[in-house]
Structures are given as C-alpha cells and as structure tokens.
C-alpha cells in the first residue's frame, strides 16, 4: 500500500520547490511590417544610403516638411551633392556619432508602459466625482494612426545633432539638412524613424512664418529650402580664399558625378543646386506696330502651371506657353516705337533643368469668397514627359524626364489637410511616405491622385528627373519580366498566411483571395493567362491605412479594376452561368442602344422645332420689312408730289395714285405732248370723286378714246411707247421749266388698299 502511494506521488504532477521562481512569459514579438518583408532579401547595406527607408516624426503639422525632405533625399544627384559638400564626413566618424543618436526601441517595455497608462486612466475614471468614462472603440489595426504608433514603438529612432563645425561651416539650414542626410546614410539599420527636431528649430529660428503650428504650404517650403541652400553655400564660399573657391561652371557637370565611398569627389562648385533644379525661361514679346521681337530671360527653380478641368500636364504646359495679348491697360512699352503699343507675349523654356519640380496651382484666390480655394480639377500626369515649349536655341530640347516623386495634398482647402509623398526608389519600386509610416505600393497606385472629386487626395508637386530612352526601355523590359515571373509564381506557389506575395516589389494582394495549389492544376488548365496581365490589388490593410484625413488612399477605389485571383474552393464556371452572363450583357447592350436611339430622336425633334421657330421668325421679319418699306415709300411720295396734286387728292395715298401702269402714263404723256404745240398745259377734266370724297386730276384724252378704252392697250403697245419716249429725251422736260413733268392719274384702284 505504501509502495502504491509512493508510485502515485511519483507519477503525479511535480510540486514546486520552496523558493523556485515561476517561468517568465516570452516577450511579445512586434508585428512584421510590409516594408520589412520587402527588405528581407536586400543583402549587404550600401554606403550611399540608397537602401535606407526611414520615416519622419510629425511634430504637429510638419507633414509639409517631411514630404519635401523625403523627395529631396531620394533624388540621387541632390543627396550626393549635399552629403559631399564641402567635404564628405568619414563613415567611421558618423558611426561613432550615431552610437549616441540612434536608439533602438524595447517593444515589450513600450507595451507595458501603454498597459500601465490604460490602467491608470481607468482608475482615474472610477474615482468619485469623475466624469463617466466613454466606451472606447477597439483600435483599427489597419488604420494609419495605429501603424504610426506601432512604428514609433518598434522601429529605431534617429536623432540629429548639429555637426556644422565638422563641416567647417556656420550653422544654417543647409548644415541641418546635411546632418539629416548623413545620419540616414551612415545608419546601420535600413528602416527607422528620423526625428528632425533640430532641422525644424533652425527653420523656425530663421523664418518666422514657420514658427506657428498652422498648416503650411509644401511648395512654398520647397522654394524656400532650395533658395536657402543656394544662399548658404554661396555665403560660405565667399568666405574662402580665392584659390579655394568654386570651379568654373563648365566643370560643374563632372563634379556632381559622385561615388558612394568616403573618398569620393566633392562638388567643388557652388552652383550644384543651379545645375540640378534651375532652368531658364525666355519671355518673347512682339510689338504689333513695328513687329520687333524683344526677349527677356529669367531663371526658375520650380515651374508653376495653371490648371484646367479634365486636362493633362502637357495641356497645362501648352497653356503656359500660349500667346497672350497685351492691350488696353496692359500695353507693352516698345523701345523701338517709343511708347505703349499692343503686343503679343509668349513664354518658352530656354534651358531645361536636370530635375524638374512641377507645381500644380491647386489653390486659387476667388473674388467671391475673398480667400483661397482648392481646385479639384482632374489633371493627368504621365510617367515620362518631354517638354515641347522650348526655344529654337535651347540646349537638349528633346530631353526625356521620368516621374520619380509626387507630393499629395489631402484635404478640402488650403488652410488644413495633410501631405504625403509617393517616391520611386532605385531598386524597390514605389513607396508611400506618410510621416512615420513607410509602405510599398504598386506603380498604378500613383495614378490615384489626378484629383477629380472634392475631399480626396490630389497631386500637388510633381518631381521629374532626366533619363534616357535606353533606361526607359530597360525598365519596361524588367517590368515585363517581373510580371511574367509573378504570373508563374501564382500558378506554381501559394501565398503566405498574411497575403503578401513572395515576389519582391509587388503590391499586397487581398488576403481573402487564394490561388490554386500545385495538386490541382487541371482545374484551371483551360484558362489562358496573358503575359501582360495587370498587377495585383493592394492589400486591404494597405488600402484601409490611408483613411481621411491623413490618408491619401481614399482614392484607392479609383484604381483600375483587376481580375481577381480564382478561389481554390470555387467551382469552374458552368455553361448555364456563362449563357446567363452573355444574355445579361446582350440585354444591357440592347438597352443602351435603345436609349441612344431615343436620345437621338429627341434631339432630332428639338432640331426640327428650332428650325420651324427660326423660319417663322424670318417670315415675320420679312413681313415687317415689307410693311416698313411701303410706309417709307408712301411718305417719300407725299414729300415729292406737286402742291396742286396734294391739294386735289385730299390725302390719298401713293397706292391710289400709282394704280396706273408706268407704260400707260408714258404713252399718255407722249400723246399729250404731240397734241400740244405751244407746250402749254391742257385743261384737265375733273375725275369722279374717290371713295374718301377726294377728286383726282385727269389728263385730256385724244379724240375717240375714253379712259376705259385707253386701259385696254396691249403690253406690246405700252413697251413701244416707253421705248419711243426714252429715245426722245427732248420731250423729257416740259416747256421752259427745268422740272420733270408730273403724271396724273386717270384710273382709281383700291385693290391694293383693300
């Protein structure tokens, strides 16, 4: 019995010994971000900083600064010029400095601190007199706010210090920018978060407009930063002795070709900012009086263009160089004419920059609202661009540009909103930089910010850098190869549990979508995959991470539709479903055709009614013109008729007096002139009274003729009499008077009056 109890105690659970410590829980592991998955096969860290992808902490409405700094860092020639001027700091010195500025996070400690803060908050809410605690919604792990918070808790934090003395320069905005770039380049971590506190302190100290926490303009900051860098570099160069100053501009192109090693060339010239960003505009003005053309050059660091609805960058540039008429108050002072003259003005580009910063003027001042208003015009921007509005003597007028960065403004107006940057890196495609969060995106994601609906994200500043046609062709070939590889991977492999594809550089796919396993290839053998299949959809966590207001991907719905990946559990499409689908398509097409025909019929009826109304209007105008002509003729006849005729007619109209034909009156007048030898007036018989009681004068008729018989003359006789009268001009004047003989009426006609 004792042995049995001992065996039970031996087989039972071991009792903890006195003083033994309980087993510790394993520390929580931070979640793996999409960026970390993309960088798993990067290899060794480079010394030029091209493989570093750091976010930037937002210190309250500093997103305008973060987005512009990210775009400038990933401009390879600009980054190399900043790091290598005036000299490049040795990597060893930078690594020693980073030992104190680069701090790695303790994820477990951060979680414990957060849990302790939550408990303290709950305890404070339970105190008597405290306001009732509002029920909190669970955190959305796909939101950008949650991702930014997790990045601040898990990723290394990089502080920047003032190292201007090591550069041999006084502290300025350029030296603080150099501190940022060198810290990232020398970091042994590919990912992390920069704290640009020192840079912001210098910016606010030197420029009062950035001292407030108000929303700032990213384009204004870009222009100010480039001008400040130029001013700081030239000011330091002026302090150096003459032999150590900048080289001639002819050597500046070679001096900016920098390598990534610590002993690389340095941009000895101070014009490296001009060589990269500066272009030259030529204003051509032609006087319309003397036709003399005058030219005036001006430089620019960024090009601002006006926008039009449903247009493109090319059309905006065409409008920028369109001819402008200078007239009225804007007349041009012509030196050749010596005064103000009307002229035509046109802007052309004389020298193209290596990096073209294109500012889309989305904020326009309106007189009605008396303030700036954001324009949500749809403006399409291409991946590759050629500028056509160049002068005839321009250097390299066929220069080809490629889009490498887009600064996006999210918000309904210029006084609030959020800025993010979408940047094309050297080896890892396009990345979204949203303050602390950095995520890979697809190439088509860049096309979601044309800006055609209010309240959504719009491209604000476009960065184009020079490239060659060979590089573009090589890139397209590489994209086709990657696309074919991704299609093969979809056919032969499966996705990970989190939905991220194995092939690097591709966007996330929906985790709900699955692909066929290798064991069932026959199910989809009848599907023919095109080699130019579109890329996959972004991951849902990627699409949801850009919610408003700090999220540009609210326009993710505008992404072109992509055929979904077939589900492994779905059955093949049956013939019945195919027939019903085709019937629906045919019914839809028939419905659209009938609607179009109905609309055309309505338009035809509207056009016909418009033609009828126009015809009626023209008829009314013709009738009114005839009536006005008759009235004016009657008035003219009354003015030119003899006084005795006016007295005897007692107000008869011209129509009553003019009832006789002109040929009849000519014939009768000829007979009167022949019968009268003394050119004296023949007594006129009184005409019977007219309808209104007035009497008309009547000429004396030859023997054997009556007024009625005279009216029976044929047309031929009348024409002969007219011809004889016209051939005998001596009878045109009567007697010794210089006036034309007046003709009297013998016949009353009331038909026209009636």
Curated annotation (Swiss-Prot):
Residue ranges with Basic and acidic residues bias: 236-245, 576-647, 717-732
Residue segments, region Disordered: 1-31, 118-145, 236-269, 494-754
GO molecular function: cysteine-type deubiquitinase activity
Skewed-composition ranges (Polar residues): 253-269, 692-708
Compositional bias per record (Low complexity), positions renumbered to this chain: 546-559
Chain segments annotated as coiled-coil in the UniProt record: 580-629
GO terms under biological process: carbon catabolite repression of transcription; protein deubiquitination; ubiquitin-dependent protein catabolic process
Amino-acid biosynthesis listed as a keyword: no
GO cellular component terms listed in the entry, alphabetical order: cytosol; nucleus
EC number: 3.4.19.12
Positions annotated as active site in the UniProt record: 63 (nucleophile), 418 (proton acceptor)
Domain USP: 54-467
Presence of the UniProt keyword Protease in the record: yes
SUPFAM superfamilies reported for this sequence: Cysteine proteinases
Domain of life: Eukaryota
Keywords for this protein: Coiled coil, Hydrolase, Protease, Thiol protease, Ubl conjugation pathway
Role this protein plays: Ubiquitin thioesterase component of the regulatory network controlling carbon source utilization through ubiquitination and deubiquitination involving creA, creB, creC, creD and acrB. Deubiquitinates the creA catabolic repressor and the quinate permease qutD. Also plays a role in response to carbon starvation and the control of extracellular proteases activity.
Family (UniProt): Belongs to the peptidase C19 family.
Name recorded for this polypeptide: Probable ubiquitin carboxyl-terminal hydrolase creB
Organism: Aspergillus oryzae (strain ATCC 42149 / RIB 40) (Yellow koji mold)
Gene: creB
